[in-house]
Amino acid sequence: IPEKFRWRNWAVDKKDGQALTGEELLEFINGADGLFNTLKNLPVDAGTPRGKSIVKEVFSDLNQYMKNGILLRQIINVIDEIDFADADDRHTFGDIYEGILKDLQSAGHAGEFYTPRALTDFMVRTLKPQLGEKFGDFTSGTGGFLTSALDYLNKQVKTTEDFENFQNAVVGQEWKPLPYLLSITNLLVHDIEAPNIRHCDSLATKMSDFKEDD
């Protein structure tokens, strides 16, 4: 990510009266050479680490619709107050995020359904996944099944090798931009450093076209 678009260089309010706000903030984010367009067009190739390529994938179909730059600045300030390096703050954020996802459990627009947590937890307990195995959901939505699997697998982590297996334990695919973004965030909240969820249509590729690496 270019230096000017890193959070610390534009979002943090240093209380010196220089923080971006109002129309200036909206232009910085939405402009032709702004934040969103830059992240949508980051150079990515087959050798790009997953932790970097995921940024382009997340922003590829996203737009920023807020019209009030002052309100947007207030939201940014609230987010910046969260210390993601602090276990308590991270846990609190995770609880809030879980609450947001619960609000999406009823049927949404276009016939979308969000699977209740109780059901995903039950199915994972039935499957009994083990570290070293892969747990996949290829219509992953907001990541409910994957995070239930992570909660189950996290209890098995005892060593550094276990932690590495935990980081690579789940894979997913999701076509719609909003659920995809929510699923990425959901895995980050569950301590997955580079979520392996692809932004693609699982039904668009024939089984015979998959390679061994896939």
Language-model regions, residue ranges each:
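Internal hydrophobic scaffold segments of catalytic domains
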Residues: 1, 213-214
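Non-catalytic, mostly N-terminal accessory regions of nucleic-acid modification and defense proteins
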Residues: 1-131, 196-207
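Conserved S-adenosyl-L-methionine
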Residues: 112-213
